[in-house]
Regions:
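Surface-exposed, non-catalytic interaction/assembly patches
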Residues: 19-24, 112-119, 161-169, 177-244, ...
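Short, Lys/Arg- and Gly-enriched loop/turn segments at beta-strand edges
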Residues: 73-84, 315-324, 428-438
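Hydrophobic packing positions characteristic
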Residues: 332-343, 348-529
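Intrinsic-disorder/coil detector with helix-boundary
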Residues: 310, 514-551
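Amphipathic, non-transmembrane alpha-helical segments in extracytoplasmic/periplasmic proteins
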Residues: 43-47, 104, 113-141, 153-178, ...
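Short beta-strand-centered interaction patches in the first periplasmic/extracellular domains
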Residues: 2, 7, 92, 99-108, ...
Length: 551
């Protein structure tokens, strides 16, 4: 097969750092490079391989490094992807025609390989990005974030899923290009690629829509430290296309009446986080005012995450657009690049979490084990681990639910370390746990003096027992009494059935009063001792009665 001069002159392919041999290029059918700002970059090389030489003798093999660059008509070269081979796909077709497809991804695919369960303590989102980039062998380009989280849990997520979720929450981009992991605010300015309709811009289909456009975004949450509502709001975003349209989406939408998007299902820890979340969501909305697809000829410099400056589209649509994905296709006809403008987010993360909702992994209750009760704030909080999630994953501080809980009021029983408890999460977010209460099991038995009841009957005993064995027991009919019993057996019984109070103590009994003490009986009163009885007063002793008998 003769070499394809158009195709081979427009691309350069390196395998493990070495330009592939010319005889391999003569077998090349097509090259596809797919770039996204929110998905791993992908490449696919298709070769004729009727003699099966590439399949059996290489040089392409799994895990090898592939770099692909494209050239403009002036000879300027632009890197398109630096990736690794993850799949080999031979195709044995009719007529004894065989093709060999080499497929791979940029190094961000390493962050998709394994789901992990772990907790991060006192960490910022930008710290996570730097840490994950290093683990994947990538350099990091990170815009610093300011909020420090006491505890963040990666719950059965891949590193990139988790990082993309964090990026979505604060309105950041998260993608890999040129061997770098980018974790940054979407750019609002920068160098752009100029394209002219009728020349190198082959086609462009924009769509201007007021769907979802609002004038304000408000985030409402709760600050338990100060016991106040948290409200973050904004009326501006930064992802409008920089075109000559006279009004932005919010202004146009205001013609229908002022619109507001209120977010109440995403827990926030502070006023600043609420404001950041509001800005992120408003920015996301502004990016959907103008969406578009376009195509250009021989422009490898069109890259995801960069700007294109479109010329010749009239007064309204000429201007700068931020590219969110670009697909470069090399065929015998030459290099064609299609690109999209899709606002802040498209692809994997937005499919998973929707436009306005967080990831709600845990809408129900889960089992946990208490690991720490030494709450530095003295709120009665505890930390727990989730045995089904991993032995090393510990939560942040979880507040307890107590009957009648309020200011210096309510029933508080902090569970001990090692106790099994039932936990729920605020709006399903695993980083905001609440402990509903403790559980009994095959090891942790129910308290003594507690019974069950046959069908149709109600249990006759209710009890509360401390860790050391002190207990309060309430008996309904027929016994009808309340017992307060210490671990050593000292007991006070309020007997409703027999209309009496019993104080049972094998040691001393002492009654003290700061002022007067009075004991009154409508019937008889009896004082009896096996030993002596002493009556002593610093003042006068008066004994009165209808008759006084002294024996």
């Amino acid at each position: 097969m003769p070499p394809n001069p158009i195709l081979t002159s427009q691309i350069q392919i390196k395998l493990d750092g070495t330009v592939i041999q010319h005889d391999l290029l003569t077998k090349l059918v097509s090259v596809i490079v797919d770039q996204h700002t929110y998905l791993p970059g992908m490449f696919a090389l298709t070769f004729f391989d009727t003699d099966l030489r590439l399949l059996d003798r290489g040089p392409f093999d799994l895990t090898k490094r592939v770099t692909i660059s494209g050239e403009k008509e002036d000879g300027t070269s632009f890197p398109l992807i630096d990736g690794e081979i993850t799949a080999l796909e031979p195709s044995f077709n009719e007529g004894m025609i065989a093709e060999f497809v080499v497929r791979g991804y940029d190094k961000s695919h390493r962050l998709f390989r394994e789901t992990k369960n772990r907790a991060f303590v006192n960490i910022k989102d930008s710290d996570l990005a730097s840490q994950f980039a290093g683990a994947a062998g990538l350099s990091a380009v990170v815009d610093a974030t300011s909020i420090v989280y006491d505890n963040l849990i990666q719950d059965n997520q891949t590193d990139l899923n988790f990082l993309m979720q964090r990026a979505w929450r604060i309105g950041y981009e998260c993608f890999v290009a040129d061997g770098r992991l980018y974790f940054r605010k979407p750019p609002t300015s920068g160098a752009s690629v100029s394209l002219t309709w009728g020349q190198d811009l082959l086609s462009f289909q924009p769509r201007m829509t007021l769907a979802e456009q609002v004038n304000e975004v408000m985030v409402q949450g709760w600050d338990p430290k100060n016991k106040v509502q948290v409200v973050g709001r904004t009326d501006s975003g930064s992802l409008y296309a920089q075109i000559r349209e006279s009004k932005d989406g919010a202004t146009w939408a205001g013609s229908f009446g002022r619109g507001k998007s209120t977010i109440v299902n995403q827990p926030v820890i502070s006023q600043s986080e609420a404001e950041n979340l509001a800005k992120a969501r408003f920015t996301e909305i502004t990016g959907t005012f103008v969406e578009a697809e376009g195509a250009a000829f021989r422009r490898p410099d069109i890259q995801a995450g960069k700007f294109v400056d479109l010329i010749g589209l009239g007064d309204r649509f000429s201007g700068k657009y931020l590219v969110t994905s670009a697909t470069h296709v090399f065929t015998p006809e030459g290099l064609k690049t299609t690109f999209t403008v899709r606002g802040a987010h498209t692809g994997l993360v937005s499919d998973e979490i929707g436009s306005h909702a967080p990831l709600e992994h845990w809408p129900g209750a889960v089992i946990a084990i208490v690991t720490n009760t030494d709450d530095p704030q003295k709120w009665g909080r505890v930390k727990v681990k989730y045995p089904w999630l991993g032995e090393t994953v510990e939560s942040g501080w979880a507040r307890l639910i107590g009957p009648g809980g309020g200011k210096k009021a309510g029933f508080l029983a902090i569970p001990e370390v090692g106790a099994e408890v039932l936990v729920v999460f605020e709006h399903g977010d695993i980083n905001f746990p609440f402990v509903l209460g403790g559980l009994w099991n095959g090891i942790d038995e129910i308290p003594p003096m507690t019974d069950s009841a046959p069908p149709g009957k109600f249990p006759g005993v209710r009890t509360w027992c401390s860790i050391d064995g002190h207990r309060i027991t309430v008996y309904d009919a027929p016994d009808s009494k309340i017992e307060i019993t210490t671990a050593s057996g000292i007991q006070v019984v309020l007997d409703d059935k027999n209309k009496k109070i019993l104080l049972d103590c094998s040691a001393d009994v002492e009654i003290k009063s700061g002022t007067n003490t009075k004991i009154t009986a409508t019937g008889n009163m009896k004082l009896e001792a096996s030993g002596n009885i002493d009556i002593q007063a610093s003042g006068q002793v008066n004994i009165k009665g209808a008759m006084i008998n002294l024996n």
